[in-house]
Amino acid sequence: WHLTDAQGWRIEIKQYPKLATIGGEGCHSDPDTPAQYYTQEQIRDIIAYAQERHIEIIPEIDMPGHATAANKAYPEYSGGGTEEHPEFTFNVGKEETYTYLTNILKEIAALFPSPYLHIGGDEVAYGIKAWETDPHVQALLKREGLQTVKEAERYFMHRMTDVVNSLGKTLVGWDELLDLNVKQDNTIIMWWRHDKPDYLRRSLTKGYSTIMCPRKPLYFDFVQYKDHKWGRIWDGFCPIEDVYAFPDKWFAEWGVSASDLSHVKGIQANTWTELMHTKDRVDFMIFPRLCALAESAWSAPTVKDYDKFLSRMEDAFTLFDKLNIYYFDYRNPQHHPEPAGPVIKKKEKIQMDFRD
């Protein structure tokens, strides 16, 4: 459960209440939107609801990047960023930052019974250049005999890995952690960059427990049909047939075989919702691709049959209709027209693409 990001902090932390009340303010279309977040009581209710249905919720508190919302609430812990990604990082040079983040993780660990705790670690490069001139980070480099800000990032992640493990949790993080040489024991790597299959191979070769969740085809905020206009389309779209064909369709491209996957714990699809502003939009992007994900996760390649899957989907569509789920109907794309999404552009880089 991705509870924090640059755009918002969505969980109550008792010791640092401004994380939610200030870090939870605003959205893409209105920076003055009142704070929206989950109270710890609401979190407990959701966990109980999930447990009754045999679902385990794993929390993610992203660090040291994607910290803009948190830094709006407590700027004294900011490590800076860039014009495009302001106040993007936590300050890894301040000892107070480690106390602050440890206290946050203690509350998270006490709240969530899952043995896993995700602390992100992705895309720190978006803000790391600010560390080159930050006096606290520079003092850390000198004190610890480090040469580069990348080594400061490694220092930070090693310390926070120890914190997570001290709380009795297994660390989960994105595939950038492979560059930081975190220990293999009690660590799970989430491989998300489909255009960097070498990171998958490195994770498996080094013996890390690995979850495969590459953007293509498992990011469900990506467009799923050629005529859809809203959604990410960076280098193609993610149709249901590709989700069903995952992962065996890409073995040759990745340079792996089924026998290499002994360390893979499973697969995961990610639905990033910072630009999904209605329930219908979320449903439309998740269903029916979620059904293909489920079958891919529990089916060996030798027993997969896409035509039979499509036949079974007829019962799923009947259920979706009964539950009033606004799904994408690949049988008749006009059955549920594509819900409009916001169009967000930054300079020349398209963040949320719209196709005329």
What are these model-derived regions, one by one?
Residues 45, 54, 98-116, 123, ...:
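Substrate-binding groove of N-acetylhexosamine-processing glycoside hydrolases
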